[in-house]
């Protein structure tokens, strides 16, 4: 029998409430987090019938990783989210778990290629990794080994509220391809999409420890054929997981390129400890991804990093949007310390949804990201604080108090004599507690310094400084947009070609800010600070 998850049952199991207080210390006010319990990777991102679906790795029974299920939230604007009942609940939850639902993706099967649709209803189909903690014979008659990871599907006929697992034939991709079948414990994270040109479904999965991606095609989402492999290339410091494959416009025109994203854990960007996400630009013909020559580097220590900070991982893209509207969401945490961050009764938040595009920057095709939230509804029209300085002398100047949730737009001349220019954020009145976001002129790097950001006691690697390359724009200016929430800072540099995302855990009264120029004066400075209101109200 297929397994139907009734919303009323799951609602009771997961403890979903209609009214909830989202005002706990460190609770992000415009970043999604579950009401309670553990969350990690975003899954099944799908825009369908005017609704954005965000599924996510979720433990319905506690604040640490375990009992992994698919949580679910919906939004009409990528800003205001409503948590829904658990979509896929770990099989056997409450007694002996025999199957967990690891990361995956979802599509709307508008042509009913799967045959799951009934009475004219479009089936939504989720493809995910089944993790089997014990060896067993499945309802499909297939046998699996202890700790096996396989790819399975489920479908929904009520726009994603309840799901039926395809027990008659799951898993639909039971094992890694030959000659990699010994990797059955590390074969995961399918990203599925419809490829218009070939009129086929395509899925890319990770053979994690080999730093390889396997690409399959299908006519019906049930029967899959291996068509190519990708990797290993570039960063290989940890396992490859949570891959993506999607097409984006180039320079806002009709030309397009394809992008592969892949998470690494550990082995993130230089200067970080733990997880990170790299990307490749190239061409995809429906079966094979061919990377551009300048997107692949000799050796395995250099990469194109999607984010240069420590807290952006498992980034996933939305199906159901045009390529010009492509949106990604990343998990704003890090496996190095994610289980120990000082939040309760939840752990983890998602980064700001980001609009992705490709632009030619410094003669190279580059992934650029910009915040996609509906800012007009939550951001103040008039700035809390606005100043311009033709010359900002060496030293510091206090800005007005900023509160806990705000956006800073900061620009200045790259020809300044200063060594660094920064803004101290979420600072105490005496600035012994602060987070610094700024620019190193000699190195041409953005930096984010959280060494004195508040509570850093839970992990000995947390109090660190992070850097990302940023060349000044064609007018000789450096431009930063900085989004601050109660427990996070996200820096978007230039056109979005460099981003830095980091969690912080400051004191409640750390609401001060100041501008700091070191080693000389900074020229042509402009700073604007806008308040951002809570999306939970």
UniProtKB/Swiss-Prot annotation:
Pfam family, one: Glyco_hydro_32N
Matching InterPro entries: ConA-like_dom_sf, Glyco_hydro_32, Glyco_hydro_32_AS, Glyco_hydro_32_C, Glyco_hydro_32_N, Glyco_hydro_beta-prop_sf
Regulation affecting activity: The catalytic activity is increased by manganese cathions, but strongly inhibited by other metal ions such as copper, aluminum, silver, iron, nickel, zinc and magnesium cathions.
Residues of this chain annotated as glycosylated in UniProt: 49, 67, 112, 300, 363, 398, 430, 531
Organism domain of life: Eukaryota
Signal peptide bounds: 1-19
Catalytic activity of the protein: Hydrolysis of terminal, non-reducing (2->1)- and (2->6)-linked beta-D-fructofuranose residues in fructans
Family annotation (PROSITE patterns): GLYCOSYL_HYDROL_F32 (PS00609)
Activity as a function of temperature: Optimum temperature is 60 degrees Celsius when inulin is a substrate and 55 degrees Celsius when sucrose is a substrate.
Subcellular location: Secreted
GO cellular component entries: cytoplasm; extracellular region
Record flagged with keyword Glycoprotein: yes
Keywords: Carbohydrate metabolism, Glycoprotein, Glycosidase, Hydrolase, Polysaccharide degradation, Secreted, Signal
Classification via PANTHER family: EXOINULINASE INUD (AFU_ORTHOLOGUE AFUA_5G00480)
Family: Belongs to the glycosyl hydrolase 32 family.
Protein name in UniProt: Extracellular exo-inulinase inuE
Upper lineage: Eukaryota, Fungi, Dikarya, Ascomycota, Pezizomycotina
